[in-house]
Amino acid sequence: MPLCGHRFAMTTTSKALRRAPALAAALLALHGASSVATAQAEATVLVQRAATAMGGAAALRSLNNVTFEFNAANFGLGQEETPASPARATFQFGRIINDYRGSRRLTTTESRVVTGAVQRQRGVVTPTVGLSEINGVQTASAAAARVNVANDMRAQPERLILAALDNPALLTMVPPKRIRGETMDGVRMGSGAEARTVWFDRLTHLPVAVERVTDDPILGDRRTTTLYTRWEDAGGVKLPREVDVDVNGRLQSHQVVTSASVNATLTESDFAIPDSIAQRAQPIPPAPPAITVMLAEIGPNVWRAEGGSHHSLVIRQGDGLVVVEAPQSTARSKAVLDTLRSRFAGVPVKTLVPTHHHWDHSGGIREYLAQGVAVVVHSRNVEFVRGIGAAPKTVAPDALSRGGRMPTVSAAGNATSIGTGDTRVMLLDLPTVHAEGVLAAYVPSLRILFVSDVLTPGPTLAPAGSREIAAMVRARGIVVDRVVGGHGGIAAWADVERAGSRDQ
């Protein structure tokens, strides 16, 4: 019996030891579930307090529409004089009606840059159709514009708090954060690309800021923070009277609400969209459409990569390719590179030349860097391009963010040449009011000059840009037959000279 008892004790102990990891895992899972439930409960309390501070959940649910008039200063991030310059401002005032019951928005604005003409805009956006009117000219809104408006309406604080109340399982606490000198409590709402973090004032319980992190071709992780202040009553609901938006710490817009009202009787004719516009409405695609790139031959071994609003110049130099301009986005650059691999099998892109730093012309640079392509850029923009490659990229990781080697980024000197012979391309500094640090690409054998933004070849040519290009050509002593645009088409040199001789 003692022996049997000993055997039984040993067997029982062994089984207990074998069960220990499973028991520990179960306890950890239970603790984890309890922690999640606690975080959700704490987050729900913050959201409920915010709803009460704004007038109560019932008042928020009773909002059929909100009308506000405003003035604003909007700053064009990515369109500065240099990468380090302050963003250029556009001043705007207007009125917006968010019709939540009808899922539509009416916008009426007037805006102008400091020295520019007034631009009058009116927009009506519904889930299925949109109208864009600029200085009296009406067009159908793009599908992407309708998506942006719908997302913005959902992101208004009165709608965001309601969505949080209705979806407590999607809430979780985040560590406190200091915002404008005060410690705020944060709640993460949703998951994935739609996730937002809302920060609440500990004294007023009102939402102070909403933060969203998305992927950006220039900034990598783009942290957009919308800050709300000066909350005042509007028909039983508190709404903010000042709204600031900053992107990675840089102010993008400052809006002052001069009046706000709720549940107005709407005039249906204000939202009317002519049949001629409605018939041209494009459905919202389930996924972004594929980008198509076509290679249009300019001359022997020289092509323009076309498709959409932005173009690149491609020069084959023996066993490698030079690409001038990487505009718009990662997707655009991938489409260009895929097209070149298909057309020139075994002939890699060895050098990329961006013309200038403006974001719509540099949004595709990172993809070239990630694929190991060396970059030659104006000396003013070297650090800007290196910054693109070094930007943290956790939302959409790439080869660089995973530890890949950064290719060389070098400065173009005075009339730097890439290659020799008939495919040699010269990089020329182009003085212009458009920006500092602009390059033009000149292929001497074909007498073509590739430029972006300074001049857009089309039915008419801008006199100012034509004069700037003509002055540079004369100063360099080069001969040009055609100007190839990064936008638009191709202009004969005689037309450029003629346009440059006209008054504005």
Protein language model regions, located:
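Divalent-metal (often Zn2+) His-rich catalytic cores of metallo-beta-lactamase-fold enzymes
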Residues: 470-504
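Flexible, processing/modification-adjacent segments and terminal tails
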Residues: 40-52, 117-119, 124-196, 202-204, ...
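Bacterial N-terminal signal peptides that target proteins for export
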Residues: 4-24
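Active-site metal-binding motif and surrounding structural segment of the metallo-beta-lactamase
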Residues: 331-376, 476-481
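Conserved beta-strand hairpin/beta-sheet module of binuclear metal-dependent hydrolase folds
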Residues: 296-342, 438-456
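N-terminal mature ectodomain segment of secretory-pathway/periplasmic proteins
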Residues: 45-52, 56-138, 172-175, 330
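Gly/Pro-enriched, hydrophobic low-complexity segments
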Residues: 114, 180-273, 442-444, 451-452, ...
